């Protein structure tokens, strides 16, 4: 199947993000170049590396939103990380290689989901057979075994995570007929609310050390989990819920995880995307203090990952040679040239995002799919309230957001969310208790609710 063209990718991004056409085009071209590269002979493919992108622009103009929407658009492993979460090797915190391990996990999740779809029909049939046996159990018979057989069975049972069983099941003709009847009812969906007791793998317990281990890039729980047997617990659930759990277990039995891991590593290495946000926060404007030195250390740790290296993951080695890296930052107190020269050179495509104008705010309020206004209209619809905004009111909201941004810290489109929350506070509070029918938000109402905020600079500071 042909990949989405750059124009199609930009059109999809336009549904959610206003303006910033240069950034959208750069991202779209970089993504489509992956498809172009895949059509070339292997000896040529090896020499074509992704052209990494550095996006710079004020906060709240769409850098992170572009990354978030990309994850929905592209059929490729995608992870978003924050540069500020990493620490230099030798310090407590996440090491930079953890972003590659996160990408490997995401690739496995995607491929696993695809493989589950292929065996879903078979898994459902097997789960239904199990449900029939549980709903109409056979006659239990005691097994008399010598001590050696009992010991062997106990060891096997413990390794499997279950308990000891000295019983076998005998199916009589009557039970067989009952099972046929139950199977027919299951197929017709007549037993969905019947309760059944099933054995499922016990969910892993929360580990208080887990967060610390995760910060240091160590996945001890998963490493130990693969070695130790899975413990099973009994749960009584409606048939509809029990089937979902049984189908999940059957799918895991039917797929080949060695193939999944191999495909996932290949996909992550050839088409993976890592978005590094807040990269401006690790620039070392002042190299004389220890904080500046530490930040430069993080940059130097990121450098070999972006240049191309091999990182060990629990699924196998993963090469970063052909992973696309997109970095973004506001660069309010620094500039891209404050990054170490070697790292600058690894992001050859530079895109500057524009600050938002009043007209941009108007479009952000109305145009995107599930825009802010559409979200509030849908929320109040749940209370039977029809919320309507006049064109003049929308224009005034945008004007106030722009003025507040100009008068205080410019936080871009994020300003709209807090202004709308302040504007609709009374409606949201009274909505569930009043039969209000249709409420129209006019320019006069907006001015009444928000004019004090614009005039009073002390109040403006609290509209974050």
UniProtKB/Swiss-Prot annotation:
Return the GO cellular component terms, semicolon-separated.
HslUV protease complex
Entries under Pfam families matching the protein? AAA, AAA_2, ClpB_D2-small
**InterPro entries recorded for this chain?**
AAA+_ATPase, ATP-dep_Clp_protease_ClpX, ATPase_AAA_core, Clp_ATPase_C, HslU, P-loop_NTPase
Q: Where are the transmembrane segments?
A: none
User: Where does the record say this protein resides?
Assistant: Cytoplasm
Which of this chain's residues are annotated to bind ATP? Answer: 18, 60-65, 277, 342, 414
A GO MF term:
proteasome-activating activity
* One GO term of the biological process aspect: proteolysis involved in protein catabolic process
**Does the entry feature the keyword Chaperone, yes or no?**
yes
Keywords of this protein's UniProt record, alphabetized?
Answer: ATP-binding, Chaperone, Cytoplasm, Nucleotide-binding
The task this protein performs is described as:
ATPase subunit of a proteasome-like degradation complex; this subunit has chaperone activity. The binding of ATP and its subsequent hydrolysis by HslU are essential for unfolding of protein substrates subsequently hydrolyzed by HslV. HslU recognizes the N-terminal part of its protein substrates and unfolds these before they are guided to HslV for hydrolysis.
Family affiliation: Belongs to the ClpX chaperone family. HslU subfamily.
Q: How does it assemble?
A: A double ring-shaped homohexamer of HslV is capped on each side by a ring-shaped HslU homohexamer. The assembly of the HslU/HslV complex is dependent on binding of ATP.
Task: Please give the name of this protein.
Answer: ATP-dependent protease ATPase subunit HslU
Origin species, per record, is: Lactobacillus leichmannii
Biological classification of the source: Bacteria, Bacillati, Bacillota, Bacilli, Lactobacillales
Gene behind this protein = hslU
